[in-house]
Amino acid sequence: MIVIVGTGAGGGLLARELALDGKPVTILEKGPYINSKDAFNYYDKYSQDVDLLTTTCIGGATIVSMSNMVRALDEELLEFGVDLTEAYEYVEDLVGVHQLDDSHIGKGTQAFLDAGRELGLNTLKMPKAIREADCIQCGNCAFGCPVDAKWSGKDFVDDAVEAGATLITEAEVTEVLSENGKVCGIKYVKDDKEEVLEAEKVILSAGAIGSTLILKKSGFEEAGREIFFDPFVSVGGYIKDINFNTEVQMAGLIIGENFVLSPHFSSFIRANIPDDNVTDKDILSIMVKTADECKGYVTDDGDVVKINTINDIRYLAEGAATAGFVLEKAGVDPNTIGSTVYRGAHPGGTAPIGKIVDSNLETDIENLYVCDASVLPISPGKPPILTILALSKRLADYLKKE
């Protein structure tokens, strides 16, 4: 029996690939099985000191993602003997990665793209896994797609179950069990009852926080002693009737040396403008994201303490300033440009390759693997979903051969 903990980019693809290969697979998900449109109800809460965007439900963070699909950390992973070239090609074809048709590039996004190019910045459409034929361009990607037009880990879990896998939802895995240095099962809690499930192999794909807590309780004291979370702010301002709030979000991309920019609506920008006549349809805003240093840790109760370095702050400031130039070039009133608070979107690096896992994502406990953003050695500074999918495909192929 192979037990997979979590149903996001890592767990979902692993479950699909292994179940289709005829392997006996049981998937455990801490959250419920939901309709995608209800995903906004399942964002996690952390301490007031950290604003971190994660979810606990079927599909994990993928169900509220923008379905952005970019390759990241290729060279860094190669240093650990991890070549994802073939895996990338497989998953890109599987989920349909492509740049959106012009029919799904709205006025605000086009203004962003035009401004970036006029300023000589490295500007392109964002690769995504969205089906234009189904997408209604509502702007609600981050709340859960109301028409299931974008890929999420839920899709792969459904495939796995159809192929014979067992799915147990609302089941919190608390510990991995081992004997003589080898996996023998897991403990989990469902309906307030502790259960034991025997397993020959266990793969933790519960996200950087969830997997870390399980590792800690399973004897890995070093897990969670460092963390990145791809910090971001949104910078925006007033441009009458741009209607950007109903566009497909993050459909454009500007790649800087130390940051990336992508058009992303934030209602918090409107609150910064002292004019009651300004509404959401009058806001154009840009997400500024950087690759932060892995300074911080995960506490034993699952809270996150993040330490911002001078470089973290410097690069975010550089990106925010560039976003201001792009917005002004795009037609935004410069007197209205403001920023949101600092937040984090992609926690990871809590069980990195080379420290907690080896190049096959296996821990010191035989047949215990980790496959999610936890294993990334450094912050990608850009959406990590495609990289996690590729790591998952590579691990699935490795396990099929055993």
PLM segments and residue spans:
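Helical element adjacent to the flavin cofactor pocket in flavoenzyme catalytic cores
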Residues: 136-195, 200
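A glycine-rich dinucleotide-binding beta-alpha-beta segment and adjacent secondary-structure elements
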Residues: 137-140, 144, 175, 318-381, ...
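Helix-loop-beta segment of a Rossmann-like dinucleotide-binding subdomain
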Residues: 94-99, 123-163, 302-308
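Glycine-rich loop(s) and the adjacent beta-strand/alpha-helix scaffold that form part
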Residues: 20, 24, 31-34, 40-41, ...
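FAD cofactor-binding and catalytic pocket of flavoenzymes
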Residues: 61, 220-321, 325, 364, ...
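Rossmann-like flavin
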Residues: 63-64, 68-136
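An active-site-proximal "capping" alpha-helix that borders the catalytic cofactor pocket
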Residues: 386-401
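N-terminal glycine-rich phosphate/pyrophosphate-binding loop and immediately adjacent elements
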Residues: 1-78, 188, 222-237
